[in-house]
């Protein structure tokens, strides 16, 4: 049996550079119904697929992808027919944990870079790391990072144990990690001063 894929998806991560695309498509049922969903694995250069690379601030090779009557065979089905609803829920949970860990890592890298800068930069002959106000701000950054680690680790543990709390904990980890990264990266830039928005340091 063959299937016809039509539709579009915006902001596909690595969509501009991928050779294969995993597509979630409705093969039965109606919109809003969690059943009747099937995963297909499709060659990115197949006729009817159009990829438009987006210029973004990061390096994830985002793309908008359009499917115009793309023919795929039943051999392209990933998993079983019309069982993708449950699979997608699991994938989204794991995806939240993965992006949480990435944001946590970025926050920790920004913090460590800032600590090094505080120990090296002098103002009026005095290391700025000796200023109590900056010490307080660095301590807050450290506390938020350590608390975020606990949240991410709890979500990872729930994934390993296939816990019923996985969705809740993965969502929590993503929320907390995002807030922590925002706080730490902003503080890191502020503590670096004007040089914090240049390419001379990774903070910029």
Where are these regions (language model features)?
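Short, ordered beta-strand-loop transition motifs
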Residues: 1-4, 57-59
